[in-house]
Regions:
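A compositional/biophysical signature of low hydrophobicity enriched in polar/charged and small residues
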Residues: 1-156
């Protein structure tokens, strides 16, 4: 589990503004946060170095780039030895179709959120990759019909 960082009072407005617009200039960010540009720059750097800000990214509409198939895949492992778990995790991390991978409790060991072109591409992902992984015993797929909420911001 990641170590919690104690945020300074000035960090919260910085983080809120950066989550709304990761391309905001340092000058505009400083003005919004009521601090000097140099103090703002130092606080942002400290948040990056402390691992609070992990990266800056653009959010792409997957439908507009041809990735219309969206599913949650529930995976069970038959073997939970460290080697099998590490191999599964390492393998899943290399796959561009896997947007999220969660280790979970309940009836599945892992939940994967998948995006790909279509059902045929998903079938290839299953047959060529997931079913071929040593230790995978069960795979259950739930198709996502509509995404009602997708939020990247977190409350700080």
């Amino acid at each position: 589990m990641a170590e919690k960082i104690d945020l300074q009072p000035a960090d919260r407005p910085l983080l809120e503004a950066l989550q709304q617009d990761g391309r905001i200039s340092n000058q505009d960010l400083a003005e919004r946060s009521a601090m000097s540009a140099s103090a703002c720059w130092r606080r942002v750097r400290a948040l990056e170095e402390g691992g609070v800000i992990t990266r800056y990214t653009a959010i792409i509409d997957p439908e507009k780039v041809g990735l219309s198939f969206h599913a949650m895949v529930h995976v069970g492992l038959s073997r939970h030895q460290a080697h099998h778990v590490e191999t599964f995790i390492r393998s899943v991390m290399t796959r561009p179709e896997v947007l999220d991978c969660f280790a979970t409790t309940g009836d599945a060991d892992y939940h994967l959120r998948i995006r790909c072109r279509d059902l045929s591409a998903y079938n290839a992902f299953l047959e060529d990759f997931l079913f071929a992984l040593e230790g995978v015993s069960t795979v259950r797929t739930n198709l996502i019909l509509r995404q009602l909420k997708h939020e990247t911001r977190v409350e700080v």
